[in-house]
């Protein structure tokens, strides 16, 4: 059998839209997803400007067990993957019967590390961090979570940078 890579779908969940149609319209209309976040200013950032991405509600889509190891970036990627699979016409049945893999880009993940350290400092107990803390802190957290949720058996890779 010949080895090949096939890109079949596209999905997006971003500060300028949470669907291809929304992103397209934002680009055509010159809309920005940048907001002034007062909390950033309170933390001492010189600029309060940031991209605002609405947090998806996954309670009706995934079990608590599936959600516990997902940071925000995994949640956004999950929503984008759902759209990409729909766009491509790929069902879970197809995924179950074939070697399907994913490739995601994800940079350093620091929020989970900061939150875990805060818990340890406050409570003086590492057990209170929770079982999902280590998975949320990995650069490969997106790919790991999605490969598990969708039961992918192909090659799953994360493209990551140091900073």
Where are these regions (language model features)?
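Conserved "HGTGT" condensation-loop signature of ketosynthase/thiolase-family condensing enzymes
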Residues: 1-155
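A short, small-residue-rich loop immediately preceding and capping a beta-strand
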Residues: 155-161
């Amino acid at each position: 059998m010949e080895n090949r890579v096939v890109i079949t779908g596209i999905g997006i969940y971003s500060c300028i839209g949470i669907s291809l149609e929304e992103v397209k319209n934002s680009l055509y209309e010159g809309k920005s997803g940048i907001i002034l976040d007062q909390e950033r200013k309170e933390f001492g950032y010189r600029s309060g400007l940031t991209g605002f991405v609405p947090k998806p509600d996954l309670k009706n889509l995934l079990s608590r067990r599936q959600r516990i190891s997902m940071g925000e970036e995994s949640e956004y990627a999950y929503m984008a993957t759902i759209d990409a699979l729909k766009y491509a016409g790929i069902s879970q049945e197809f995924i179950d019967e074939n070697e399907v893999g994913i490739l995601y880009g994800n940079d350093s993940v620091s929020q989970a590390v900061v939150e875990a350290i805060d818990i340890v400092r406050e409570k003086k107990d590492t057990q209170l961090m929770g079982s999902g803390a280590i998975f949320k802190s990995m650069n490969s957290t997106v790919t790991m979570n999605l490969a598990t949720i969708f039961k992918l058996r192909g090659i799953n890779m994360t493209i990551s940078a140091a900073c």
